[in-house]
Amino acid sequence: MTLVYQSTRDAKNTVTASQAILQGLATDGGLFTPVSYPKVDLDFDTLKDASYQEVAKLVLSAFLDDFTAEELDYCITNAYDSKFDTPAIAPLVKLDGQYNLELFHGSTIAFKDMALSILPYFMTTAAKKHGLENKIVILTATSGDTGKAAMAGFADVPGTEIIVFYPKDGVSKVQELQMTTQTGENTHVIAIDGNFDDAQTNVKHMFNDVALREKLAANKLQFSSANSMNIGRLVPQIVYYVYAYAQLVKTGEIKAGDKVNFTVPTGNFGNILAAFYAKQIGLPVGKLICASNDNNVLTDFFKTRVYDKKREFKVTTSPSMDILVSSNLERLIFHLLGNDAVKTAELMNALNTQGQYELTDFDAEILDLFAAEYATEAETAAEIKRVYESDAYIEDPHTAVASAVYKKYQAATGDAAKTVIASTASPYKFPVVAVEAVTGKSGLTDFEALAQLHEISGVALPPAVDGLETAPVRHKTTVAAADMQAAVESYLGL
């Protein structure tokens, strides 16, 4: 039986995996979400020797079950190839008291590559499957990493245009240059005077604007998303949690069946939600530890059951987590409410109109799977330094948030279970923060810091940043948040 994906806000709005990938976001504003979980044979005696691509085939064929085996082989083979700088794709590194799952070996040195390398292949395959003649317009808001990874994936892919919005003052210099120097005739990058939540909210509004959808259709265009709101972004992220567990079995760190914790730096809630789905298909997970920075709306939610976005937005050194409206939490809320779309829609409406909601009647077993804590800016910098002094290993600030939060969790609970930290970006993406934390040197430019980081770490400068300083800037547009739709219509000639 084909797996059903349902909107979190309307039980009657159901689609297959390929349809969900093409649509991106449900027309009612909800997110397409599995209402049941596929059966997956997680035999770690076999999986411990499997390649990343083989684990991907096992997981993806279960969740994307209206794709044929040949179609998935095509997608996987083209996605996980020499774009990654290691055959392991996502190597697991043992440090003192923790394991870092390095998700930054792709072409843009951030974890978004893990899913955005394969999403274009999913999308073009799904379009062919459904005889779609419209051009797909990928409309995406980014807090720094998704935008570049999405453009790298979709650049010059026939039948697509991609438009990326990012907060002008909410990304690192390296992140901004990675985006604004992006090549590809079909790529468009626009800075906004506002924060990520402004960008994401306006993108959602455009998806839900019936008049705009009709105008697009009349011009043989349709929107889809490269954000983790798209199930085609989320499902590939399940793969690396299964792969990490298999590596722990292979190296004798655990026995098959032992429970493992995962600590995940969290902004939009997609990465940790993928770990939750891994648990649902049988991965032996102990705790999922949700790590936030000073924008600690999720920490408060898990501790109080109240989600309240009415708070100061803080710009931090871990910008990909500078988010107050965590979109993918809606999927977890849906599951916590027993897949009740009516109740989920009510809570999301309350968030939209009143700025908060309270979870009162929920599945306690699901919620108990999560722990949550946050790390301040000072704690994040101190953790980068501690890990360097302990292991001669440099974490990026997002990974350091997770690492610091894990230490707090351990101190509070005494939980001795083996724990994997999702290491979501290379320190080369945030060189100023990394170098300042390790050496105390301040006032460096990004490019001075890149050279220093290379000297300190001994790790080669990745192609993603090598030559960035002299690359021509192709995208120079900045608009007010309120003018985002006008910019989209202008680019598309509507």
Kindly give the residue locations of the regions a language model identified.
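PLP-dependent amino-acid enzyme catalytic core
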Residues: 1-494
